[in-house]
From Swiss-Prot:
Organism: Thermus thermophilus
HAMAP family in the record: Ribosomal_uL29
Protein name: Large ribosomal subunit protein uL29
Superkingdom as given in the UniProt entry: Bacteria
Keywords carried by this UniProt record: Ribonucleoprotein, Ribosomal protein
InterPro entries: Ribosomal_protein_uL29, Ribosomal_uL29, Ribosomal_uL29_CS, Ribosomal_uL29_sf
A single cellular component GO annotation: cytosolic large ribosomal subunit
CDD domains documented for this protein: Ribosomal_L29_HIP
Keyword Ribosomal protein appears in the UniProt entry: yes
Pfam families linked: Ribosomal_L29
Length: 67
């Protein structure tokens, strides 16, 4: 987890936005699977939401530094 955060801090804001969009798409797919009963590992939704929050935090930090 710490490595992922360090890697995210190395990315540019544009790359971070792209990664957030990809993760949100994954979250949408997981929610769909959960709604039709195909998802057996419900913790993946929570983990993915936390990843998105971390990425958004890093993105906001970068935006504040550039402002």
């Amino acid at each position: 987890m710490r490595k992922q955060l360090e890697e995210a801090r190395k990315l540019s804001p544009v790359e971070l936005e792209k990664l957030v969009r990809e993760k949100k798409r994954e979250l949408m797919e997981l929610r769909f699977q959960a709604s039709i009963g195909q998802l057996s590992q419900n913790h993946k939704i929570r983990d993915l939401k936390r990843q998105i929050a971390r990425l958004l935090t890093v993105l906001n930090e970068k935006r504040r530094q550039n402002a």
